[in-house]
Amino acid sequence: MAMPVVQVLLLCALAYQAVDAQWTPATATFYGGSDGAGTMGGACGYGNLYNAGYGLNNAALSSALFNDGAMCGACYTIACDTSQSTWCKPGTSITITATNLCPPNYAKKSDAGGWCNPPRKHFDMSQPAWTSIAIYQAGIVPVNFKRVPCQKSGGIRFTISGRDYFELVTVFNVGGSGVVAQVSIKGSKTDWMAMSRNWGQNWQSNAYLNTQSLSFKVKLDDAREVTVWNIAPSNWNFGTTYTSNINF
């Protein structure tokens, strides 16, 4: 089978990279155990984070940062604030990908266990990521963070789930800003159709597209866009992941 043809559309002459010039204060805790197993899955829909290309450098975001799933896939560099805590490991920082939601806990005060309650900016990091910047026994530390471009290996991936008249497509391993803002789908016998966000980075179509090859347009929150032609062949199957040869 011929490799899919990929068209890259640059909407701006100088593509904007999602980089924050200034550091922003927040706090950070950890979850998921020393092997990070408890961080697999999550509210972004990426499933096994190793298979999805994200690994253990991941974090759940408080709702103030998560934005109902719109920030899934964003990358942040996080540094422990040594000016406020002796539990920090000086001179260290780590870049993580947002893969989950840290839900509010309104039974606790925001400064006494309800770390993810709005309007707090908080990262609940995988334990391996967290202990690279702070001492395990601390439990919670003050940090500074900034959003940075995502560096991913290989192409954008699409997992097609669902059933007839309901395609649920997970878009992942996305570079650049990392944050998918819009997805469109095209069957070989249809025009382009906008997909709607179902949850996290799962995008929904209600068209009947069986026996048609499928193409996708992926637009990031910085307005950059790629078109991936015929990534899924006409005999595609639900439950299958298709990997493109392009990324941002």
From Swiss-Prot:
One of its GO terms (biological process) is plant-type cell wall loosening. It is a peripheral membrane protein. Disulfide bonds: none annotated. SUPFAM superfamilies: Barwin-like endoglucanases, PHL pollen allergen. GO terms for cellular component: extracellular region; membrane. Keywords: Cell wall, Cell wall biogenesis/degradation, Membrane, Secreted, Signal. InterPro entries: Expan_Lol_pI (IPR007118), Expansin (IPR002963), Expansin/allergen_DPBB_dom (IPR007112), Expansin_CBD (IPR007117), Expansin_CBD_sf (IPR036749), RlpA-like_DPBB (IPR009009), RlpA-like_sf (IPR036908). It is found in: Secreted, Cell wall; Membrane. Residues 165-244 form the Expansin-like CBD domain. Residues 41-155 form the Expansin-like EG45 domain. Residues 1-21 form the signal peptide. CDD domains: DPBB_EXPA_N. It comes from the Eukaryota. May cause loosening and extension of plant cell walls by disrupting non-covalent bonding between cellulose microfibrils and matrix glucans. No enzymatic activity has been found. May be required for rapid internodal elongation in deepwater rice during submergence. Belongs to the expansin family. Expansin A subfamily. This is Expansin-A33. It comes from Oryza sativa subsp. japonica (Rice). The gene is EXPA33.
